[in-house]
Amino acid sequence: MLKIIWVILSIVLIGLIFLRTPQNQGLASFSTKSNLLGSPSSAEQFLNNLTIILMIGYFSFAVFLNFSI
């Protein structure tokens, strides 16, 4: 059961990382950048926090499954 949760968590984490937009898009991003000083918007901050939480969960499951074998 834990292995299934671990696989689902890894797939969701990979999908979340691929959905993220790149931070540096060259000189064209300066003209279209709406937020001053590069501060992330609330949605981007939420994605950052969600990614960190899922990574901690992924590594916790990896350590737990490694010791249970």
From Swiss-Prot:
Recorded superkingdom: Eukaryota
UniProt keyword annotation of Nucleotide-binding present: no
Cellular component, GO, one term: chloroplast thylakoid membrane
Pfam families tied to this protein: SecG
Residues spanning the membrane: 1-21, 49-69
Coiled coil spans: none
Subcellular localization, as worded in the UniProt entry: Plastid, Chloroplast thylakoid membrane
InterPro entries per the UniProt record, alphabetical: SecG
GO terms of molecular function: protein-transporting ATPase activity
Keywords linked to the UniProt accession: Chloroplast, Membrane, Plastid, Protein transport, Thylakoid, Translocation, Transmembrane, Transmembrane helix, Transport
Listed GO biological process terms: protein secretion
Membrane topology summary: Multi-pass membrane protein
Protein task: Involved in protein export. Participates in an early event of protein translocation across the chloroplast thylakoid membrane (Potential).
Family: Belongs to the SecG family.
Listed NCBIfam families: secG
Protein's name according to its UniProt entry: Probable protein-export membrane protein secG
Species: Skeletonema costatum (Marine centric diatom)
Gene: secG
